[in-house]
């Protein structure tokens, strides 16, 4: 029986398909084009915090966030479906793609939300959600973003250690391909306000600068 908490390797991952997922491009909440690239002066980053429904809502509510979408990244399968990701055979984690204006919302402030609003010490799970698709992750799009993310990890790890918490397991690395999730999942909690939200946290605040 497949253990969904063990990462599949590239040789054993599902192949996927060449055809990209067709998604509704208009953001259900703010009307932005979720398929658009970051424009000059904007940045993008990918956050994995467990189930992407609650994580996306966290970020679209922030001033300075231009657009959000949910999808799959960090694995091997081309253009996976949700069912394939749930199988544990794609290597992908559920992520939120955040496009933001760093002049309004610096990356450091986004990262504070990231660290505080989920438990980054749980490995291949988040709360009761088990599997590699729920692992904590930050996928960056520049050397500067990577440096800031790694520095924030060190700062939050120190705060966790002071409270006798476990070690951070968050995967932090340059972003690979991002594959949009099905339209059903985009802005899910705006369409289904009583839907499941698995966001939690350790209760440890990010230390002040």
Curated annotation (Swiss-Prot):
InterPro entries in the record: Met_Sox_Rdtase_MsrA_dom, Met_Sox_Rdtase_MsrA_sf, MsrA_MetSO_reductase
Record-annotated membrane-spanning stretches: none
Gene Ontology cellular component terms for the protein in this record: cytoplasm
GO biological process, one term: cellular response to oxidative stress
SUPFAM superfamilies: Peptide methionine sulfoxide reductase (SSF55068)
Reaction(s) catalysed by this chain's protein: L-methionyl-[protein] + [thioredoxin]-disulfide + H2O = L-methionyl-(S)-S-oxide-[protein] + [thioredoxin]-dithiol; [thioredoxin]-disulfide + L-methionine + H2O = L-methionine (S)-S-oxide + [thioredoxin]-dithiol
Keywords: Oxidoreductase
The organism's place on the tree of life at top rank: Bacteria
GO molecular function: L-methionine-(S)-S-oxide reductase activity; peptide-methionine (S)-S-oxide reductase activity
EC number: 1.8.4.11
Gene3D superfamilies: Peptide methionine sulphoxide reductase MsrA (3.30.1060.10)
Active site: 51
Major enzyme class: oxidoreductase
HAMAP family according to UniProt: MsrA (MF_01401)
Function (record text): Has an important function as a repair enzyme for proteins that have been inactivated by oxidation. Catalyzes the reversible oxidation-reduction of methionine sulfoxide in proteins to methionine.
Family: Belongs to the MsrA Met sulfoxide reductase family.
Protein name, UniProt field: Peptide methionine sulfoxide reductase MsrA
Organism: Vibrio vulnificus (strain CMCP6)
């Amino acid at each position: 029986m497949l253990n969904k908490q063990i990462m599949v390797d590239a040789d054993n991952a599902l192949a996927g398909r060449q055809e990209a997922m067709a998604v509704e491009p208009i953001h259900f909440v703010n009307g932005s084009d979720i398929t658009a690239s970051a424009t000059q002066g904007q940045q993008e980053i990918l956050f994995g915090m467990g189930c992407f429904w609650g994580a996306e809502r966290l970020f679209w509510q922030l001033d300075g966030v231009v657009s959000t979408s949910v999808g799959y990244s960090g694995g091997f399968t081309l253009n996976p479906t949700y069912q394939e990701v749930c199988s544990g055979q794609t290597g992908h984690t559920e992520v939120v793609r955040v496009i933001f204006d760093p002049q309004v919302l610096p990356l450091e402030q986004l990262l504070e939300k990231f660290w505080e609003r989920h438990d980054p010490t749980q490995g291949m799970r988040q709360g009761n959600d088990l599997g590699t698709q729920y692992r904590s992750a930050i996928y960056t799009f520049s050397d500067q973003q990577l440096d800031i993310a790694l520095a924030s990890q060190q700062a939050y790890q120190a705060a966790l250690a002071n409270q006798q918490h476990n070690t951070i397991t968050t995967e932090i690395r340059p972003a690979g391909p991002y594959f949009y999730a099905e339209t059903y999942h985009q802005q899910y909690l705006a369409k289904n306000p009583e839907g499941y939200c698995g966001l939690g946290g350790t209760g440890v605040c990010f230390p002040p600068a």
